[in-house]
Amino acid sequence: MTSDLSLAQRAATSEWASVEPGLVDAVAGWEREIEDQRTSVDAHAARLARPGRLPVVRTAWQYGAFQLSRAGWAARHLPRDIAERRMLKEPAAWAKESVAHVLRDQLVLLGPAGAEVARIIDESEGLAPGFLVDEVRRRPITVPAVEGRVVRQIVARAFGDAVQSVDDVALTHTPMSQLHRGVLADGRRVAVRVRRPGIDLAMHADARITARLAGALERLVPALREPHPLGFVELATRQMLEEADLRNEALNTVALALAVEKLGITGIEVPRPIPGLALPRAVALEAVEGRPFATAAHQLDPEKAALALVGITVEAALVEGVFHADLRPEHLAVLDDGRLAVWGCGTLGCFTPETRRGALKYLMGVLSGDFAGQVEAMQLSGAVPEGVDVARLVDDLQATPGLQPMAMLSGGQESAMAGIREAVVILLRHRLRPPIEIVLFVRSIFSLRTLLARISPEADLLHALMPVVQRLPDLAQELDVS
């Protein structure tokens, strides 16, 4: 369970941390360097993801990308839509599909920052507007890895002679960063993650511009108000802010590893960051030899892998108050002994005592069909603003067949996921605004289903969650949740 101790103080009593000389002192130093940044990341994201003063150059780039995307859509689709009179027959569906097509093409033209937003949209099933999720999955956006020559220059500027060499080819990469094998000056093999050049500046500018665009769309297109696109802009900004400073990667890895150690999770290995080698643009960690999850997931034992993945997300969140909040194939590896390994933890979910109790109470309410209890849980988490008709919200939840416990649980994981999606739609319709950490937690549950499907088509999320479900009464008693 989380405590008032700092991460360094908790690491000081950890067997996992003791293996790396100097790690505890390094953690204390990293905490001092970015304490204010880490504690205010949600507020910073909220400020950026609001309409405000726009950066001139990036705004011009965004405007050009939007005009090109709109022109491409008009040339390819508008004549057919006019001929079929879709805007008259299906105005809401036509508006959503058209906006999704244009925005997806605009993200392509915005480069790596746009690709990262698309990736976050893809991961946010049930939370991001569904028409956007469908579009980026139908037409995925990818970016190539940064050249090895550039990576070596970044590492040399960051760490000088401390890192002797870095492999040209990345083990894995995302629009934000990439991971390479490397060798320290003393011959020790490590893994080095570097931030993509310029991504931090583009991300800051794009957040403000996208917020202005999302606000305008909410006002001009009624069909887009219910999904609350501004809320998604805030979610994406929060995640990208944390990912952009790789000192967070070092601290997140330590926090996750301490939770794994305390919970006794044996099916996953978390590498230790190397003391003295963590800066905003680069970080070095222990070398974890393995194969990318994307190509080797089918070789895992489904049950053991499911326990490990649930352990670092749902179980860690409810028991320890921290969880891996960006669990995607690029952040996982498969070891030769059949275990998983963490190759990246750029985003860590951190519950306050109130959000932790709220999440626990909500899950218990879902399983028992206590809809009033579910709304009380959301109030406890700070998700229900003033002016919400609570009684009507409870009635709407209770009147939805797909949210009844028997309907959600008897149909397997697909029924459960469909129920969560229905619940999100109802909550947004009532203008609920859950804290970002709760949104990240819900998103992690959807990510689990996707990862388990890669391991085995027969893997079932509900079965994997049962050990945690069985612990809910004890956790409720521990946290005084009624």
Predicted regions located by residue number:
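Glycine-rich ATP phosphate-binding loop
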Residues: 188-195
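Short, amphipathic alpha-helical segments that act as regulatory/interfacial helices
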Residues: 111-115, 211-214, 254-257, 424, ...
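Helix-rich C-lobe and terminal helical cap/extension of kinase-like folds
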Residues: 10, 15-38, 42-53, 93, ...
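Residue-level signature of catalytic and energy-coupling elements of molecular machines
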Residues: 118, 179, 192, 249, ...
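Conserved ATP phosphate-binding architecture of protein kinases
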Residues: 178-184
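ATP-dependent phospho-/nucleotidyl transfer catalytic cores
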Residues: 130, 137-144, 156, 204-205, ...
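Hydrophobic residue at the +6 position relative to the catalytic HRD Asp in the kinase catalytic loop
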Residues: 330-334
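N-terminal accessory/targeting segments that precede structured cores
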Residues: 1-178, 201-227, 459-460, 464-467, ...
